[in-house]
Amino acid sequence: MVLIFKCLQLGITGNITKILHNFLQNRTLQVRWRNSLSGTKPVQKGLPQGSVVSPILFVCFLADFSETLDVGVEYSIFADDIFIFCAHTYLDHISKKLQNTMENVYKWCNYWKLNISPEKCSIADLSKKKLPSIPRITYAGFPLPWKQTIKYLGINFSKINQNGIILKNIRSKALRKINALKSIAYKNYGPRTKDLINIVNNSICSLFYYSCSITNKFSETQYKACNTIQTMALRVALGLPKWTPNIVLMKIAGQEVLSKKIKRLAAQFFIRQLANGVHSPIYDQNCKPSIKLIKRDEVMLANLFTELDTSTDHIIAFPDTLISRSNFCEIFLSDFSFQNKAHSAFLIKDLFEEVVYKEFQDYHIIATDASKSHSFTSIAGISNLQSFVYRIHPINSIFTAEALAICQALDELSVTDKNLLLLTDSYSVLQALKCLTIKSPKVIHRLAGKILVRKNFHQKISLVWTPGHSLIHWNEKADLLAKTVTESHPLLEWIAYEDIISRYQTISLQKTNLSFQHSKYQE
């Protein structure tokens, strides 16, 4: 099989290849229509729909597709949608490059026994210049049709009035869904109002959220059209008359104004890319930004970080090398008897000292803690040699603070001639570290990276969860240190992007509530 051969080329060998071969062989399908079931038909091509392994195998199949691209031609792939593009000042140069690429794609498809339907393909010019002539670009001798707009991942790209075309397309979809919503909303036995609002948010307004990094370029007039769609849908969901003021409508529904939420989600998208660092698709292979933000987006992000009193340089990002395994250190969450909170504080203390004496007698002990109050968010760490106390950005959650405390302890309190025992009362941080995945918070990846660095100097690193406020003197000292922070203590400016997004969302909702409170409709 072609796919198995490609897997072997990629270095996927052994039993996994045999399993994949068995998984793909002798597959059949049947079609169910109402209560009838069709006959069995063998599947000769393709991958099973809905299978977890199918997307991975499809990526393996397309792994060498980039070799078909001529120099200067780029591509974007999502599932089986391929978007090939080229930019240059001369049209003849672009035509030649694209034609060469199409010929290479045809050879590649023939070699790997893959069929492409050229009649389903299209080509468009997205430059601001008027074309002197329409170049002829073919695939397998079939001329690719030129179109005014080209659709990729549900977004219409156009040379003229792109925002207007996108809005028109989304608006037509939204109106169809609003009409469908009316059929279930105007009934005494229909869904609850809360569920109808969720339908509006997740089915209608989400059409605008999906492409927020593009729709945030709308003009104010186009934004008003978006808001009209939202208020129309909410009136149907709430069963309120047309003359209900929009500000009252938003307050009752507990929703943000759609145009403001689009801008917020766009900002969150760009912040997330900053946090992903070199692993973000906006960076090229040389770790340099491959795209440039337009002026409006730059101003939006600058204003946001000014409002939050921080900068993009202080966002906790993915480490350059991602960690794909979770067994890089020992993590004890419920392995010892003292980790049972049902015990009394005095018993927990005695059991802890017994475990340390038996299991960690020669370890260098470090305890960390974090504190969050109306005045400060702080972290602290202590060992029998030294200690530290820092203020951190108040936006950071207590989860982020606890993780940063361990990171700082590894930097400042470690010794090179002993194994390390780190004590923390944050169960959630250790649980996240133990279950490390690509989707884990960035601060957990930062912590994992620091542990791996320290493992070069230590035989063992053990992290142990200790119940809080249980008279364990190490924890009590760290807790006291964290709570004694003042303005004079040094500031660590690191901030988690997850906390920025959470804070930004809170501020946005507060602005909606303030608008209502300052309106004439507030009693």
Where is each model-derived feature located?
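Catalytic palm subdomain of template-directed nucleic-acid polymerases
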Residues: 1-10, 83-107, 162, 217, ...
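Conserved pre-catalytic core of RNA-dependent polymerases
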Residues: 1-48, 86-87
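Mobile genetic element proteins and their domesticated derivatives, centered on retroelements
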Residues: 7, 20, 31, 50, ...
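Short, conserved non-catalytic motifs in the polymerase core
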Residues: 31-57, 85-91, 160, 182-193, ...
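Short, conserved micro-motifs composed of acidic
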Residues: 35, 100, 114-148
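Active-site palm subdomain of RNA-directed nucleic acid polymerases
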Residues: 55-85
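RNase H-like, metal-dependent ribonuclease domains
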Residues: 128-131, 139, 186-190, 194, ...
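Basic, alpha-helical interaction scaffolds
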Residues: 142-214
